[in-house]
Amino acid sequence: MGSSPQSSTRTLLGLLFLLLVQLSSALKFDLHASSGHNERCIRNFVFKDQLVVVTAIVSGQRGDGQVVNMHIKDALGNDHGRPKDIAGETRQAFTSVADTAFDVCFENKLVSHHGVANPYKSVELDVEIGADARDWSSVQAAEKLKPVETDLRRIEEMVAEIVNEMEYLRAREQKLRDTNESTNERVKWFAFGTMGMLVGLGVWQVVYLRAYFRYVDFPVSWRVDGVVANCCSCCEQVEASYLRSSRVVFWSPLVMWTRLSWLILR
């Protein structure tokens, strides 16, 4: 006995929904009380114009010596809610203004011990973003949609969110690639310029030293047996050559490069 087309369609939609739906599970943790300002934050990312619904369930009750405050903020400095002294279930909804990360922060202030050695409260947090945050029951009732049509609408929005996320990742990857290529290009030309400058400085130094030794021309003669001849007679000439070369040494390439580097680094 064959299955009906409606049953096959429901099965196909159910499988597609399981493939596309984002797995969301509530986060549960213990928030210990303290007298100072000690926040515990959970971060998530949201795209522009997406609906975000934050649901927090805090154990205990008001007036038990612990005050739990919640603060929702994004990386751009916008505040999306500051409920104070929450207990039980608390819901906060907002629409993002840009592609950014947002934090859901909790703090548990200790007012009085009430005989408890290590007071704390349990927090169960559930964050729904985009298609998961919409109330599809109200959408179905308002637009008079069939269950299959409602599932198709939800899957359509989830696919659109996935496409937008892929487009965002592609644009970000392209931006990072362009930055990497431009940095590589600047480093390459800087290396070529440094090598050319060093080669030019070396050639300049060789030419300078060659002209320098020709200009000094020390008149010292050597005998075959290694004893210096005419040493005393040439001392005055060596001193005069040194004094004449002092002006040339001042314009030495190495001296000029050292002074220029010192001025730059200073």
Curated annotation (Swiss-Prot):
<keyword id="KW-0653">Protein transport</keyword>
<dbReference type="GO" id="GO:0006888">
    <property type="term" value="P:endoplasmic reticulum to Golgi vesicle-mediated transport"/>
</dbReference>
<dbReference type="GO" id="GO:0000139">
    <property type="term" value="C:Golgi membrane"/>
</dbReference>
<dbReference type="GO" id="GO:0005783">
    <property type="term" value="C:endoplasmic reticulum"/>
</dbReference>
<keyword id="KW-0256">Endoplasmic reticulum</keyword>
<comment type="similarity">
    <text>Belongs to the EMP24/GP25L family.</text>
</comment>
<keyword id="KW-1133">Transmembrane helix</keyword>
<feature type="topological domain" description="Cytoplasmic">
    <location>
        <begin position="210"/>
        <end position="266"/>
    </location>
</feature>
<keyword id="KW-0472">Membrane</keyword>
<dbReference type="InterPro" id="IPR015720">
    <property type="entry name" value="Emp24-like"/>
</dbReference>
<dbReference type="GO" id="GO:0006886">
    <property type="term" value="P:intracellular protein transport"/>
</dbReference>
<dbReference type="InterPro" id="IPR009038">
    <property type="entry name" value="GOLD_dom"/>
</dbReference>
<comment type="function">
    <text>Constituent of COPII-coated endoplasmic reticulum-derived transport vesicles. Required for efficient transport of a subset of secretory proteins to the Golgi. Facilitates retrograde transport from the Golgi to the endoplasmic reticulum.</text>
</comment>
<dbReference type="GO" id="GO:0007030">
    <property type="term" value="P:Golgi organization"/>
</dbReference>
<dbReference type="GO" id="GO:0005793">
    <property type="term" value="C:endoplasmic reticulum-Golgi intermediate compartment"/>
</dbReference>
<dbReference type="GO" id="GO:0030134">
    <property type="term" value="C:COPII-coated ER to Golgi transport vesicle"/>
</dbReference>
<feature type="transmembrane region" description="Helical">
    <location>
        <begin position="189"/>
        <end position="209"/>
    </location>
</feature>
<feature type="topological domain" description="Lumenal">
    <location>
        <begin position="27"/>
        <end position="188"/>
    </location>
</feature>
<feature type="domain" description="GOLD">
    <location>
        <begin position="39"/>
        <end position="129"/>
    </location>
</feature>
<keyword id="KW-0812">Transmembrane</keyword>
<dbReference type="Pfam" id="PF01105">
    <property type="entry name" value="EMP24_GP25L"/>
</dbReference>
<feature type="signal peptide">
    <location>
        <begin position="1"/>
        <end position="26"/>
    </location>
</feature>
<dbReference type="GO" id="GO:0005789">
    <property type="term" value="C:endoplasmic reticulum membrane"/>
</dbReference>
<dbReference type="GO" id="GO:0005794">
    <property type="term" value="C:Golgi apparatus"/>
</dbReference>
<keyword id="KW-0732">Signal</keyword>
<keyword id="KW-0813">Transport</keyword>
<keyword id="KW-0931">ER-Golgi transport</keyword>
<keyword id="KW-0333">Golgi apparatus</keyword>
<protein>
    <recommendedName>
        <fullName>Endoplasmic reticulum vesicle protein 25</fullName>
    </recommendedName>
</protein>
